[in-house]
């Protein structure tokens, strides 16, 4: 169908641009924030099409994005950059599971960066809670913090491994989950807990007295 460019929707413009690029049979394809100008519905539709395109592309594709979810869904390999420096690279799932540095953890969306001191190869002392945490990953000598993703916390009893006593500070509601900010008992440290409404369906969620994270979910981080 023939259309004047100005009459194309955002999604149609993106599809047209991709078609023009692919017509030249490139060996390298660079996509710089390809979905940033689209609304959420179009973004998901176009992203799905681009994912199918990349799966069949016989060449090298480079996606530049600030959206961690796009990178996770579309890229088998990723590189985390900050001010022109490579902070972490490797298989995408490995980078998310073990970002290694505080900056890389933040760029992959980790909300809980908790200061700590190293005790041994798999144990840290968590500042603010005055408790030890057990980690599955090796703790490097220069470890100054641990990263715990907000959805990796679960309610637990006082004696559970890696149990952290918490008190409620604030909460906010999303369509399908809750964001809760909790503090250490003395209020000197805080953490984010993201929990689905299927777990906490109350209109005014109250966090438990203790939250914990599995050793496999705790990431040792350096500066």
Language-model regions: role of each:
Residues 111, 122-223:
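Non-catalytic connector elements of ABC transporters
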Residues 97-120, 147:
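C-terminal boundary and immediately downstream tail of ABC-type ATPase nucleotide-binding domains
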Residues 1, 5-103:
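ABC ATPase nucleotide-binding domains
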Residues 10-11, 84, 90, 109, ...:
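Glycine-centered flexibility sites
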Residues 91, 103, 117, 165-167:
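Residues located in well-ordered beta-strands
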């Amino acid at each position: 169908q023939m259309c004047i460019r100005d009459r194309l929707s955002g999604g149609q413009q993106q599809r047209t641009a991709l078609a023009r690029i692919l017509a030249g049979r490139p060996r390298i394809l660079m996509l710089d924030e390809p979905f940033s100008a689209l609304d959420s519905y179009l973004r998901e539709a176009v992203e799905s099409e681009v994912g199918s395109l990349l799966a069949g592309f016989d060449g090298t594709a480079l996606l530049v994005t600030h959206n961690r979810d796009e990178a996770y869904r579309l890229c088998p390999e990723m590189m985390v950059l900050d001010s022109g420096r490579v902070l972490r690279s490797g298989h995408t799932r490995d980078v998310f599971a073990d970002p290694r540095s505080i900056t890389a953890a933040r760029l992959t969306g980790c909300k809980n960066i908790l200061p700590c001191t190293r005790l041994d190869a798999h144990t840290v002392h968590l500042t603010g809670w005055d408790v030890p945490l057990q980690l599955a990953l090796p703790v490097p000598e220069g470890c100054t913090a641990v990263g715990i993703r907000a959805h990796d916390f679960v309610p637990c009893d006082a004696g559970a491994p890696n149990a952290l006593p918490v008190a409620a500070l604030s909460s906010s509601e999303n369509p399908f989950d809750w964001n809760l900010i909790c503090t250490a008992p003395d209020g000197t440290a805080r953490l984010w807990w993201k929990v689905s409404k299927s777990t906490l369906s109350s209109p005014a969620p109250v966090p438990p007295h203790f939250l914990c994270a599995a050793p496999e979910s705790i990431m040792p981080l350096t500066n």
